[in-house]
């Protein structure tokens, strides 16, 4: 009797794992993983989230309202002069989306993959590798979005979002978080130990400092500017800055497309890696 029940369950799981795209890749249950992460998150330390929220606020107070008093106005990419605080706010908003998404899609994923052995258990159910990828990336996206919304609620009443187009900064931050989370999880799937994880921070810090976050990239030689423009955070900063300052142009469509490509590439490689690691 028990053998019959177990066999029947195995058959049903195998059928579900065939999924909508075949080969056990997708069963349409990514939302269950997001729900699982939320339930686990409710019992975790909220200080982690609070620290991610207050970090950009501290940068704003120190640089925007502190050093900004000494600097005065800054000329943006369209030739308009804005206050220094208004100049760095969209960059800090984009950085918040990036940091929240990267944290969950790298360190948390690394622990689940190599120590918690959670993905092995998940992929033994009806979940497919794309379900896991979408679920984890979706959760990381929500974290990045939460940071961005919290920061917007702080800076908007201060008059640091001069354009009504700034309302679209939240959907923009969602796109940014989705892109970073997708690539972050894909990169993490190749990491074998904590020492290799340090390479992520090694890349993130200079990108944060030199991507037009605190000053225009025009201060650099032309060849360095081209390198910076290729960085995802610079694309994010330019997208959000254009929205919050009301400087809309065709280049913003290119910035958005950049993250669409990031999302597609990240999902593809993450799904491939999870399939190769745990389902082959």
Where are these regions (language model features)?
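Hydrophobic transmembrane alpha-helices and immediately adjacent juxtamembrane helices
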Residues: 1-167, 171-280
